[in-house]
């Protein structure tokens, strides 16, 4: 809203929206709520009634798909905290259709992130279209929209599989055409391309503080770590590292890239092959345009990092570095 986005185009996600969240979205005319439970549907209905608004909703389904990705970013399996199982969904849909201040406009699902195989996307479509067919037969309900989520991958290292997103979308488009004809169901389709359109647009620069070896491992310590990028700590997500101030140096070492937090697990990478470094060198971590700045914290009282945008060869600061006072400004 502060960025002057059209409110009607906003989709309000989250598996546990508070009453404050719901009221804020409704009174600011958010286009859709992605409802995660019957409790949430009831809350949306009750709050919408106070504003005399019939709120549009997509119901998040859990199709029970294994997307063959890291378990911590697998969001569409039967044990996921997200969404409503297909076995429970019919009763929830029936209730949603009875709520006077809810407009159930369709369904949403998202099976996970960094999915390098097309099969899980196609399997999910088969399952959800079959489900929609059954719902039409039993409840007479046809969705206006189906949001199939995202999960389209990016390559963080050369070891990641080669991908062609055009092939993904062609396969998904062909499958949609097939299923619409089979089931005679034709909802508008939404997708969430997410990191696949922004990850490669960013990199993170760190300054080397020290380089040391303990006889078993080499360590490069940097002025950041899990407080600004927790992905390796959380999922052992791998990155490509480059010595930015001397990229052509062909003398390589193997080292762990260590952060400055008080955790032995505060690493950005292990056994990384990188040019020899010394104190003051700059290391670039590539492909951090998604899930880096948005995941940073003040853990260990580390300052938030600045973000610099490059446009037409010009630099523009779009996020300022936190000052020490910024770390304390909410403390009484």
Predicted features by range, described:
Residues 1-145, 154, 175:
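Active-site-proximal beta-alpha core segment in soluble small-molecule metabolic enzymes
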Residues 38, 62-64, 110, 149, ...:
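Anionic group-transfer/hydrolysis microenvironments
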Residues 3-5, 26-27, 49-52, 72-74, ...:
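Solvent-exposed alpha-helices and their adjacent loops that cap or buttress functional pockets
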Residues 138-145, 182-190:
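Flexible, glycine/charged-enriched surface loops at secondary-structure junctions
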Residues 65-69, 112, 144-160, 190-201, ...:
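Flexible glycine/acidic-rich beta-alpha junction loops that bind and position SAM and/or redox cofactors
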Residues 171, 177, 184-332:
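Charged (often Lys/Glu-rich) extended helix/loop segments that serve as interaction or gating elements
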Residues 117-124, 155-167, 198-210, 270-273:
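Short glycine/threonine-rich loop-to-helix capping motif typified by GTGT followed
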